[in-house]
């Protein structure tokens, strides 16, 4: 991927949701909600503080994260649908 986010931005690839309920009902693609989890593919260097020093991000490449349904800006890179969002749009890191 030839994309390097700036500042406190993070590039996330959405993870696929289950398309079948626990009782075995298959949910069609057009009825399924967009997943609110993704994998961090790239991170920016971080925000700058008042003195011009970078404040490192709390997330790292490879983290599985939770974010809001409408978080981020969708972009298409090398045929992949990705999200570019600020770190503050990420609600949590999922521990594996």
From Swiss-Prot:
Protein name: Co-chaperonin GroES
Family: Belongs to the GroES chaperonin family.
Pfam family, one: Cpn10
Gene Ontology biological process: chaperone cofactor-dependent protein refolding
Subcellular location: Cytoplasm
Coiled coil (UniProt feature): none
Subunit structure, as described in the record: Heptamer of 7 subunits arranged in a ring. Interacts with the chaperonin GroEL.
Function: Together with the chaperonin GroEL, plays an essential role in assisting protein folding. The GroEL-GroES system forms a nano-cage that allows encapsulation of the non-native substrate proteins and provides a physical environment optimized to promote and accelerate protein folding. GroES binds to the apical surface of the GroEL ring, thereby capping the opening of the GroEL channel.
Entries under PROSITE patterns matching the protein: CHAPERONINS_CPN10
NCBIfam families registered for this protein in UniProt: PRK00364.1-2, PRK00364.1-5, PRK00364.2-2, PRK00364.2-4, PRK00364.2-5
GO cellular component: cytoplasm
Gene Ontology molecular function terms on file: ATP binding; metal ion binding; protein folding chaperone; protein-folding chaperone binding; unfolded protein binding
Keywords linked to the UniProt accession: Chaperone, Cytoplasm
Origin species: Cupriavidus metallidurans (strain ATCC 43123 / DSM 2839 / NBRC 102507 / CH34)
Major place of residence: cytoplasm
């Amino acid at each position: 991927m030839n994309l390097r986010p700036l500042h406190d931005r993070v590039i996330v690839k959405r993870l696929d949701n289950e398309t079948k309920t626990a009782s075995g009902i298959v949910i069609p693609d057009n009825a399924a909600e967009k997943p609110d989890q993704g994998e961090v593919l790239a991170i920016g260097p971080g925000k700058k503080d008042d003195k011009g020093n970078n404040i490192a991000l709390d997330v790292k490449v490879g983290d599985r994260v939770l974010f809001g349904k409408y978080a981020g800006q969708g972009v298409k890179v090398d045929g992949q649908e990705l999200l570019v969002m600020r770190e503050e749009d990420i609600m949590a890191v999922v521990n594996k």
